């Protein structure tokens, strides 16, 4: 909670406003609180984590292409240059990841992508999960 820049609070209006008031009174840095229904709040969380998983998956694929092309730059230099575009940034572009392995292995990402897949059967979400399983099997 300490580093959070915003909160999405889902539930009935009275309960959500009460929670929001508690957050505002305890966490002075929080300026942006949005209130919505519980389903929308859940979809926001799942969508954020799915997007982050997709970024990791995307950059793992780009890493393979960078190596295959025989680029003279290191992947780290390359990723930094790509991230200079403010629309892209540096977030979730490190390959291998912080655990020294390819792909992602996060309880929240795994759980939230599973939930999102269950809701709508999205072929994109399914493919992200399949590619990640492939990436995780690669030895770094």
Region locations from a protein language model:
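Structural/interface elements that position substrates and couple domains in central-metabolism enzymes
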Residues: 1-140
């Amino acid at each position: 909670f300490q580093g959070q820049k915003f909160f999405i609070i889902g539930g009935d209006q009275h309960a959500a406003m009460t929670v929001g008031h508690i957050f505002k009174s305890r966490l002075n840095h929080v300026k942006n609180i949005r209130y919505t229904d519980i389903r929308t709040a859940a979809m926001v969380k799942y969508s954020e984590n799915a997007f982050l998983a997709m970024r990791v998956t995307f950059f793992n694929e780009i890493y393979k292409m960078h190596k295959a092309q025989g680029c003279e730059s290191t992947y780290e230099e390359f990723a930094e240059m790509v991230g200079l575009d403010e629309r892209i940034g540096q977030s979730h572009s490190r390959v291998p990841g912080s655990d020294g392995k390819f792909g992602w292995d996060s309880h929240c990402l795994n759980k939230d992508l599973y939930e999102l897949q269950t809701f709508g059967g999205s072929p994109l979400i399914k493919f992200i999960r399949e590619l990640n399983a492939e990436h995780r099997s690669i030895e770094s």
